[in-house]
């Protein structure tokens, strides 16, 4: 080749060399020193600049489950230039989140997290120190006190039972009204409103604006939240996307801003008639803790209350709403299952009273149905991302400090090593051999609320709420769809995954009151 030809190719050669050097620098920058005796987690080769973003696709839980079958329970991918370790397998996840919980209790400093309550959310904030732990305990105690604790002024066994019973009966009335008017309905918005009223009553008591249009519009737009707080959201790993037109991100910002303003206003109104000698809701309990904050070193200054209430509201809302919606759709597609639940309710409850929380141990088939909803749908496919708080190791692999960790709950719930026919909806799998109780060992293998030090603070109240809502609804109603209507159970990926809306659900009274 003539020298002149080399000269003509110089710009292309320089560009290729520059690209190669940049790629090499990026890849080298993501590598860490691995201590002797340990290995780096395995994983596939990624593309320059974008890493494995395209590999994740529209359903990252499925893509990463497939990769785990090839690379094992601890694998590593890159999203952009950020290394992400993906954990699968129940035993591996328990080892990380429970036995090595202090190592894996962090949160990554993701951009989308900074938009939630102005970056001060207890659930999404990277802080995992002693102040965070103490505030988390206080939030858990407040939630417990005004949900499963006894209400001395009510005939109900606890606050939660009182609020759910009231809202479940309202929901039945709304369904029957829609049946009389149209003959079918779309259940999501009705369920959203009822569940929001329950958690709102527990948070604010009589101060919660039950029929506020502002509140209803906010909770009905919660999809703008769950679509953005997802494992693998591109905006968290590619900063340039924050400055480009992004309608979904704009809706997410607006939702968070508006919801915080709504909570600030409601909390402030609540404070006007706060009486420390008569605590009747979660916010009141938090006010009491905040009163002596400066005097005795308490852990909740008043300005933090909105942030904590926001976390509690979220913990008691999205999971319950999604579980009930999935339940209704699977009831209409599995009529034999619905019939068995009806038979159990008729035998145990009869027709002279409503189900109560105390009936739960005597309704094992309904409980098995709910567990199978959690497992089969796995509608929380990943936990909120974790991060490591220090250099650590897992299964012989080195994981550096501040490494982003994805926990694949969907894989755990569909692991063929743990479950027979995992892709079949079969509530009976959770019953003991004599069908009289729940197989506790098997039920503890279901993952939906996370594990360890970041386990969802609303797990117990949420499970009780789902049970009582469904028990009351199914005691009174039979759910169907008209002949020929097909229900699409294909979920849309997000923090919580919901199936497509079905506008042709029907609810028929089972007996006259």
Swiss-Prot record:
Any one GO BP annotation for this protein: response to tetrachloromethane
Cofactor(s) listed: heme
EC number: 1.14.14.1, 4.2.1.152
Residues given in the record as heme binding sites: 456
Residues that carry a glycan: 68
Induction section of the entry: By 3-methylcholanthrene (3MC).
Gene3D superfamilies hit by this protein: Cytochrome P450
A single GO molecular function term of this UniProt record: demethylase activity
Compartments, record wording: Endoplasmic reticulum membrane; Microsome membrane
InterPro entries: Cyt_P450, Cyt_P450_CS, Cyt_P450_E_grp-I, Cyt_P450_E_grp-I_CYP1, Cyt_P450_sf
Predominant location category: endoplasmic reticulum
Family named by the database record: Belongs to the cytochrome P450 family.
Subunit organization: Interacts with PGRMC1; the interaction requires PGRMC1 homodimerization.
Name recorded for this polypeptide: Cytochrome P450 1A2
């Amino acid at each position: 080749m003539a020298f002149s030809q080399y000269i003509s190719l110089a710009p292309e050669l320089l560009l290729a060399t520059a690209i190669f050097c940049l790629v090499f620098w990026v890849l080298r920058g993501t590598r860490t020193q691995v201590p002797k005796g340990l290995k780096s987690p395995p994983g596939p080769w990624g593309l320059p600049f974008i890493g494995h973003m395209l590999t994740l696709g529209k359903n990252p839980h499925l893509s990463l489950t497939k990769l785990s079958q090839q690379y094992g329970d601890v694998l590593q991918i890159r999203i952009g230039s950020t290394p992400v370790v993906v954990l699968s397998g129940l035993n591996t996840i328990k080892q990380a989140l429970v036995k090595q919980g202090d190592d894996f209790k962090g949160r990554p400093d993701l951009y989308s997290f900074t938009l939630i309550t102005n970056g001060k959310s207890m659930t999404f904030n990277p802080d995992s120190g002693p102040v965070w732990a103490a505030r988390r305990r206080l939030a858990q105690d407040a939630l417990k006190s005004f949900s499963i604790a006894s209400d001395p002024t009510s005939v109900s066994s606890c606050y939660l039972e009182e609020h759910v019973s009231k809202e479940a009966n309202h929901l039945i009335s709304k369904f029957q009204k829609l049946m009389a008017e149209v003959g079918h309905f779309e259940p999501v918005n009705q369920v959203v409103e009822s569940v929001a009223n329950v958690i709102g009553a527990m948070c604010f008591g009589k101060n919660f604006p039950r029929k506020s249009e502002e509140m209803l519009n906010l909770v009905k737009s919660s999809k703008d939240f769950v679509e953005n707080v997802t494992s693998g959201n591109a905006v968290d790993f590619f900063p340039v996307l924050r400055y480009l037109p992004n309608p979904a991100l704009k809706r997410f910002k607006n939702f968070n801003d508006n919801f915080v303003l709504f909570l600030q206003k409601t909390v402030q109104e609540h404070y006007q008639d706060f009486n420390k000698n008569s605590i009747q809701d979660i916010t009141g309990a938090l006010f009491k803790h905040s009163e002596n904050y400066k005097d005795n070193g308490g852990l909740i200054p008043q300005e933090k209350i909105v942030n904590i209430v926001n976390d509690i509201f979220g913990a008691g809302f999205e999971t319950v709403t999604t579980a009930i919606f999935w339940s209704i759709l699977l009831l209409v597609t599995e009529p034999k299952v619905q019939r068995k639940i009806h038979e159990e309710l008729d035998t145990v409850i009869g027709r002279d009273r409503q189900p109560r929380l105390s009936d739960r141990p005597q309704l094992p088939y309904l409980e098995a149905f709910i567990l199978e909803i959690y497992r089969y749908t796995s509608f929380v496919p990943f936990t909120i991302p974790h991060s490591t708080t220090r250099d650590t190791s897992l299964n012989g692999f080195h994981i550096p400090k501040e490494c982003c960790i994805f926990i694949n709950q969907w894989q755990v719930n569909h692991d063929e090593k743990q479950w027979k026919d995992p892709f079949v909806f079969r509530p009976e799998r959770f019953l003991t051999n004599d069908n009289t109780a729940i197989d506790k060992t098997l039920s503890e293998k279901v993952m939906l609320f996370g594990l360890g030090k970041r386990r969802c603070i609303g797990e117990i109240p949420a499970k009780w709420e789902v049970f009582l809502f469904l028990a009351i609804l199914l005691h009174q109603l039979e759910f169907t769809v008209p002949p020929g209507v097909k229900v699409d159970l294909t979920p849309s990926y997000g923090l919580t995954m919901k199936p497509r809306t079905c506008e042709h659900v029907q609810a028929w009274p089972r007996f006259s009151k």
